[in-house]
From Swiss-Prot:
Gene3D superfamilies named in the record: Tetratricopeptide repeat domain
Gene Ontology MF term list: RNA binding; zinc ion binding
Start and stop residues of the PPR repeats: 38-68, 69-103, 104-138, 139-172, 206-240, 241-275, 276-306, 307-341, 342-376, 377-407, 408-442, 443-473, 479-509
The organism of origin for this protein: Arabidopsis thaliana
Annotated protein name in UniProt: Putative pentatricopeptide repeat-containing protein At3g23330
Pfam families: DYW_deaminase, E_motif, PPR, PPR_2
Lineage: Eukaryota, Viridiplantae, Streptophyta, Embryophyta, Tracheophyta
Chain's gene name: PCMP-H32
Span list, region Type E motif: 514-589
């Protein structure tokens, strides 16, 4: 018996000496054999079972106790919580209270965590009140659990201030509770003030303490405060670790301060921690956001161990820097390397398909998303809506949108902009109004979308209403994109002088891109006099605006003013400017075929020319007359018609038709504005071939069908 008592005393001091299920069962059996299984010893065995996550064995023994001690209750409640059985943990707490047992400070952290995970703020507040009545609100771990609960559930009706919880916690040390609790608290922007207050009164601080406050400041956008804490840390004997540096590096990418970032990179190399995956991912992200993608690639290539975060960082970096093909290539390598793509990876790579207008790759990614179980992720679903819209399949985009269970301003904006770019202006406006009725507050991007929609269908009065409501109703500042959309609207409506005055009186300095919207309208309405004034405005603020030079050359050519055009082209040559080659591409059998205006190198060029000659005869019979006014060469009319014949969009459309079954929709993408003559020609081709032809240029989608275009001949 004395040996059993000695064993009990030893286990009371250190029950974690039992490391396996067999050892725990042997101890349990020994207590039974020696008839020493009292409530105290049973509670110890229950504690050991729960430490080993043997919930079934713990509950069997627990149920044999007529009046379980607090230690037994604590062990069972904690085990329920650790195994995510939160409702059972709370039910056990209620049962414990009903039994007359008074919980000690070891019980409350598990109970409060269960309240947090169940999102049961009301129950949590009642527990908080009970804690205060017992005088246990000063316990360090209980206070941390309270902070975590309020940080996560604040804003759901709580009348208790998070700061007050800390006011009642006089005990503070560098080991101030569970690290998960600290991490969860510090990332909440509204919790950073409370974190700071705790940090300031801590008598001793360690690296974890500094990491918590630095990460909190950084993730709350309080970069100067984060850097101040790094400098303060440098005055102590503490040294930054990988978590410190991975928190600080993103700050420099936000500041675009790559010099300081490289200094930290040097420190990392000297300390021999450059292979750390967290630091590596942060370095990749920092260099990418600083437009130094080659440095990102070098850091990535030197990582011995690459996790999903490091892969995602470089994929996102490629997309941020407009290197969409590289992003898709790296994503394929990621999948080949057996790294399972997560939500972040899909959210990064899907926009690459949108920018490249590669529908077949977008569909493949959509399949990956569904197989990976991410179909309900709001960020991925919104990216898919945007991708299908920009790849010319607005029906698929709308189908995904209509199936989304949760909609935010991003998903609403994606579908509104999609309909706007496809010429469905009235539908886009209707969706914008529905978004407001659903209680979703439009942001600045949403207003760009609805103003674009109004512009494409000529809703002048509605556009003015939306533009003015930004500041008066929603407190949003109008930015350059909003002014450009209104200027474009006025120009499309033929109100060129009003558009000129509107831009001249902008609250912010108009850029070349804003003036360029009006220049395009001058070209459409053939107002050369105003176009010259607008062009000079553009060249003043953006002397290398290639689009403005090309538009003015087109206008001079169409008016037969070859001398002025020659002067402008000489001006371009002196500046070293060259017209961007007109390129169009089309996907065919999972392969992208590209065409450049005037290029005859494509293997199918003979068949393309044969088709175009045949269809041209039918077009001319139905009234087609080539519009050669935009040809920038002083040559005879026959030569001009030959030049138009080789435009890239026409070649791509012809290639699509001769390589698909009758009735198949043709989708073509062009890098610049579709030319006037090709626009007319493709309308005829759509009628003759009975095809729907969708052309995406650099401003919108043109849906050609039965001889008409969705843009109403205004783009």
């Amino acid at each position: 018996m004395s040996s059993s008592k000695a064993l009990i005393k030893t286990l009371i001091k250190n029950p974690t000496r039992i490391k396996s299920k067999s050892q725990a069962k042997q101890l349990h059996a020994q207590f039974i054999r020696t008839q020493s299984l009292s409530h105290t010893s049973a509670s110890i065995v229950i504690s050991i079972y729960t430490n080993l996550k043997l919930l079934h064995e713990a509950l069997l023994l627990f149920k044999t106790l007529k009046s379980p001690p607090v230690l037994a209750w604590k062990s069972v409640i904690r085990c329920f919580t650790d195994q995510s059985l939160f409702s059972k943990a709370l039910a056990s707490f209620v049962e414990m209270r009903a039994s007359g047992r008074c919980p000690d400070h070891n019980v409350f952290p598990s109970v409060l965590k269960s309240c947090t995970m169940m999102m049961d703020l009301r129950f949590g507040e009642s527990v908080h009140g009970f804690i205060v009545r017992l005088g246990m609100d000063c316990d360090l771990y209980t206070g941390n659990a309270l902070m975590n609960m309020y940080a996560k559930l604040l804003g759901m009706g709580s009348k208790i201030s998070v700061g007050n919880v800390f006011d009642e916690m006089p005990q503070r040390t560098s080991n101030s509770g569970d690290e998960d609790v600290k991490a969860e608290t510090c990332i909440m922007p509204f919790g950073i003030d409370s974190v700071r207050r705790v940090f300031e009164v801590m008598p001793r601080k360690d690296v974890v303490s500094y990491n918590t406050i630095i990460a909190g400041y950084a993730q709350s956008g309080m970069y100067e405060d984060a850097l101040r804490m790094v400098r303060e840390m440098g005055t102590t004997d503490l040294k930054p670790d990988s978590f410190t540096l991975s928190s600080v590096l993103p700050i420099f990418s936000e500041y675009v301060d790559v010099i300081k970032g490289k200094e930290i990179h040097g420190y990392v190399i000297r300390k021999g921690i450059d292979s750390d995956v967290y630091i590596g991912s942060s370095l990749v992200d920092m260099y990418a956001k600083s437009a130094r993608i080659e440095d990102s690639e070098r850091v990535f290539s030197r990582l011995y161990c690459r996790d999903g975060i490091s892969w995602n960082s470089l994929v996102a970096g490629y997309v941020q820097n407009g290197r969409y093909n590289e992003a898709l290539r790296l994503f394929r390598q990621m999948v080949t390397a057996k790294v399972k793509p997560g939500a972040v990876a899909f959210s990064s790579v899907i926009p690459a398909c949108a920018h490249l207008a590669t529908l077949h790759l977008g569909k493949q990614l959509h399949g990956y998303v569904l197989r990976g179980g991410f179909g309900s992720n709001i960020f991925i679903a919104s990216a898919l809506v945007d991708m299908y819209s920009k790849c010319g399949n607005i029906k698929a985009a709308r189908k995904i949108f209509d199936r989304m269970n949760v909609l935010d301003e991003v998903s609403w904006t994606a579908i509104i902009m999609g309909h706007a770019l496809h010429g469905h202006g009235h539908e886009a406006v209707s969706l914008f109004e529905e978004m407001k009725r659903q209680g979703v507050k439009p942001n600045q991007v949403a207003f760009v979308a609805v103003l674009t929609a109004c512009s494409h269908v000529g809703l002048v009065d509605e556009a003015w209403g939306y533009f003015n409501s930004m500041t008066k109703v929603y407190g949003l500042n109008q930015e350059l994109e909003h002014y450009a959309a209104v200027a474009d609207l006025l120009g499309r409506a033929g109100k060129l002088e009003e558009a000129y005055n509107f831009i001249s009186k902008m609250c912010v300095e108009p850029t070349g891109s804003v003036w360029s919207t009006l220049l395009s309208s001058c070209s459409v309405h053939k107002n050369l006099e105003l176009a010259e004034k607008v062009a000079e405005k553009i060249f003043t603020v953006d002397s290398e605006n290639m689009g403005a030079y090309v538009l003015m050359c087109n206008m001079y050519a169409s008016n037969g003013r070859w001398k002025e055009m020659a002067k402008l082209r000489l001006r371009m040559r002196k500046k070293g400017l060259r017209k961007k080659p007109a390129c169009s591409w089309i996907e065919m059998k999972n392969k992208t075929h590209g065409f450049v205006s005037g290029d005859r190198s494509h293997p199918s060029m003979d068949k393309i020319n044969e088709f175009l000659k045949a269809v041209m005869e039918q077009m001319e019979k139905e009234g087609y007359v080539a519009d050669t006014s935009g040809v920038l060469h002083d040559v005879d009319e026959e030569h001009k018609r030959e030049l138009l014949f080789g435009h890239s969009e026409r070649l791509a459309v012809a290639f699509g038709i001769i390589n698909t079954e009758p009735g198949t929709t043709i989708r073509v993408t062009k890098n610049i504005r579709i030319c006037t003559d090709c626009h007319v020609a493709i309308k005829f081709i759509s009628k003759i071939t009975e095809r729907e032809i969708i052309v995406r240029d650099n401003s919108r989608f043109h849906h050609f069908n039965r001889g008409n275009c969705s843009c109403g001949d205004y783009w």
